[in-house]
Curated annotation (Swiss-Prot):
Stretches assigned to the Cytoplasmic side: 1-44, 212-721
Bilayer topology: Multi-pass membrane protein
Binding site for Zn(2+): 498, 502, 577
Active-site residues per Swiss-Prot or TrEMBL entry: 499
UniProt cofactor note: Binds 1 zinc ion per subunit.
Listed PROSITE patterns: AAA
Subcellular location as annotated: Cell membrane
Cofactor dependence: Zn(2+)
GO MF assignments: ATP binding; ATP hydrolysis activity; ATP-dependent peptidase activity; metalloendopeptidase activity; zinc ion binding
Family assignment from sequence similarity: In the central section; belongs to the AAA ATPase family.
Spans through the membrane: 45-65, 191-211
Protein name: ATP-dependent zinc metalloprotease FtsH
Length: 721
């Protein structure tokens, strides 16, 4: 029992160490098992030990009875025959090795024939009979076949009567017994103990492997063995992040706490347990979290909200627990959950309670943090309005930091950071690039420089020039160009009028963005596009005049097509324009309260649980639709009037586009200011007309020569006739 108790304690400590990972008197460690759980675990261990002992005993018994007996070789001292009661008897005087004991064995003539027959048939000879009438002791031999002409002699009570005199057989058996004789061993056979022990050991190993494999398969089926967080050491610093100075200021305090937590604990300060970063995609939320971990030089656990969920119920909550346990052991550390809205949306909207379980576990872990644990949770989302209110309350994600799209100065700083390892030409102006990339995120700006570098390599240039950056911006906005796309001259002209209509309205609408570029080069699914950027720094708020200007600019393309080609020749090129127009006007009517429908917000701009569920009546929906259509038709009429009023300028823009295919702001401003074609367009047009005139004159000269030769040929024919 003492030995069994020791084994139980050994297994208990092993399992407890695996369950609890480490034992420390630390509040950040998981709780110890309850006494009831410990008793249940000990009972399971004792049960399996008893099962193993029973199985080992059964295997040992089977091996004991299946192992052939060992025989000690005996040395035959003499072998002689005598006649006793008219029977021949063989006397064997033998001695064991390493022993002086002499044993006398007897065998009579009656055994010989049967023994001979059984030996030849490869069978054991064992026939019991009564030989007391011979006056001999009840001793005979069991001859067991060991191999060709080799036999062992063992003790049995065997006699075999036989009739007749068989001297030849007698002599044969005498020689065989003399050459090979043996009796059962009286020593200890170690196989009786060793074999069961070996069997038990192999069985335990086999059982361990089976349990491990089955557990791995079960975990794989449940998806619980999938790593849900990457532990890394971040090498990013705040100097690697540009354009978010106010965000850095908010996070410096977090970095200081991770470096010197005792200072804040001693002062009784409660550092925010969670930091929520929200903003548009590509603004650098993940990069900021890495910079915080890099500045504080602490482990960085990175995961996504979707990695917590799986097919089976309870897996998400388990992964949340495991992630926070790992972070506690590595404290001070940072947990970063990207796209947290996929796991922490408002509760009650999901079809099942699986997601609610994960949210509840996440809330519990955030509340369970000790203020001195040294673990900071950072999360990122593009939709703060969809998150559960309990996530954002003080004590969980206390600090909510907005990471917006960079303005022109911040874009220039981002471009400078990403151009550190780029060989830019001295003529490249990053300020100009920043001005032309309004609305670009940090990720898009990095992509612009990378595309420009690839284009420079393709052109075998030693540095990145402005034309490479122009093409890179176009690629990011509309995709790569399609120079090999076959387009008719009429379609090319109609695309020019469409884009010129956008640009013309942008030039004359108050509050409209500045027209930076117009192109009719096909890119992606677009036959052309017009690039506009804000005249001033980007504003967070937009007024009604600016929204109306965006609507008019988008309507300019269709209006120009209809005025030039008629209502029956309009194209599908305005589909995306109408999509933008409808969204802007619908927001003005139903969200911003900018029309006669009223100041009520019928369509929420944030926290929409179900976008297909209306919170207003059918009459209100009809009023909204009527107001939207009224505004669009009113603005469309104004746009057509503006195009008719500035028809001459529209034609100049179209001629320039047909000549150059892509025109930039200086050329657009020249046309708008002087109402004439830019000098380079005139020069290019004159050059093309001159080359065409020269080609036509060459054709005329060739035609004259051909006519003269034909006249001469006719004259020759007439003379010959």
């Amino acid at each position: 029992m003492y030995f069994l108790k020791k084994i139980v304690n050994l297994f208990s400590s092993k399992i407890e160490s695996e369950d609890n990972n480490v034992k420390k008197d630390d509040l950040t460690q998981p709780r110890k098992q309850s006494p009831e759980a410990r008793k249940r675990r000990n009972r399971r261990i004792i049960f399996w030990l008893i099962i193993l002992l029973i199985i080992g005993t059964i295997i040992g018994v089977i091996i004991y009875f299946s192992v052939r007996k060992e025989y000690d070789n005996v040395i035959v001292k003499s072998a002689q025959t005598e006649v006793v009661n008219n029977k021949k008897v063989l006397y064997l005087n033998t001695i064991r090795p390493n022993s002086t004991q002499i044993t006398r064995y007897t065998i009579d003539e009656d055994q010989l024939l049967t023994a001979r027959v059984n030996i030849l048939n490869n069978t054991n000879f064992q026939i019991i009979s009564n030989a007391s009438s011979l006056g001999l002791s009840r001793i005979s031999f069991n001859i067991v076949r060991e191999g060709v002409e080799k036999f062992k002699l063992g003790e049995t009570n065997i006699y075999a009567p036989i009739s007749g005199n068989t001297n030849n057989q007698w002599n044969w058996l005498t020689s065989i017994i003399t050459q090979n004789a043996g009796i059962p061993s009286s020593g200890f056979n170690p196989q009786v103990i060793i074999s069961p022990l070996i069997s038990i050991i192999f069985f335990i190993i086999f059982l361990y492997i089976i349990l491990r494999v089955s557990k791995a398969q079960s975990d794989s089926l449940l998806g619980t063995n999938k790593a849900n967080a990457k532990l890394t050491k971040s090498g990013v610093r705040f100097s690697d992040v540009a354009g978010i100075a106010e965000v850095k200021e908010e996070l410096i305090e977090i970095v200081d706490f991770l470096k010197e937590p005792k200072k804040y604990v001693a002062a009784g300060a409660r550092i925010p347990k969670g930091v929520m970063l929200y903003g548009p995609p590509g603004t650098g939320k993940t990069l900021i979290a890495k910079a915080v971990a890099g500045e504080a030089n602490v482990p960085f656990f990175q995961t996504t909200g979707s990695s917590f969920e799986d097919t089976f119920v309870g897996v998400g909550a388990r992964r949340v627990r495991e992630l926070f346990e790992k972070a506690r052991k590595s404290a001070p550390a940072i947990i970063f959950i990207d796209e947290i809205d996929s796991v922490a949306k408002k509760r009650g909207n999901s079809l099942t309670a699986v997601q609610d379980q994960t949210i509840n576990q996440l809330l519990s872990e955030l509340d369970g943090f000790d203020t001195s644990s040294g673990v900071i949770v950072m999360a990122a989302t593009n939709r703060l309005d969809t998150l559960d209110d309990a996530i954002l309350r003080p004590g969980r994600f206390d600090r909510q930091i907005s990471v917006n799209l960079p303005d022109i100065l911040e874009r220039e700083q981002i471009l400078r950071i990403h151009s550190r390892n780029k060989n830019l030409s001295a003529k490249v102006s990053l300020e100009d690039i920043a001005r032309r990339t309004a609305g670009f995120s940090g990720a898009q700006l990095e992509n612009v420089l990378n595309e420009a570098a690839l284009l420079s390599v393709r052109d075998k240039a030693t540095s990145i020039h402005m034309n490479h950056l122009d093409e890179a911006i176009d690629r990011v906005i509309a995709g790569p160009s399609r120079p090999n796309k076959v387009i008719s001259e009429r379609e090319r002209e109609q695309v020019s009028y469409h884009e010129a209509g956008h640009a013309l309205i942008g030039l004359y609408s108050p509050g409209a963005d500045v027209v930076q570029k117009i192109t009719i080069v096909a890119r992606g699914r677009a036959a052309g596009y017009t690039l506009q950027t804000p005249e001033r720094n980007e504003n967070i708020l937009q007024n009604k005049t600016e929204l109306i200007s965006r609507v008019r600019t988008a309507l300019g393309g269709r209006a120009a097509e209809e005025l030039i080609y008629g209502p029956n020749e309009i194209t599908t090129g305005a589909a995306n324009d109408f999509y933008k127009i409808t969204n802007i006007v619908r927001a003005m009517v139903a969200s911003f309260g900018m029309t006669d429908v009223g100041l009520t917000q019928y369509i929420a701009t944030e926290g929409v649980d179900n976008p297909y569920r209306n919170s207003y009546s059918e009459q209100t929906a009809l009023a909204i639709d009527i107001e939207i259509e009224k505004i669009i038709q009113r603005e469309y009429k104004i746009v057509k009037e503006m195009i008719n009023e500035h028809r001459e300028e529209l034609e100049l823009i179209v001629q320039t586009l047909l000549e150059l295919e892509t025109i930039l702001k200086p050329q657009i401003d020249y046309i708008h200011q002087y109402k004439q074609l830019p000098p380079e367009v005139i020069a290019n047009k004159n050059k093309r007309e001159a080359s065409q005139k020269q080609a036509n004159s060459s054709v005329e000269e060739a035609k004259v020569v051909d006519d003269e030769e034909s006249i001469k040929d006719k004259e020759k024919d007439q003379k010959s006739n």
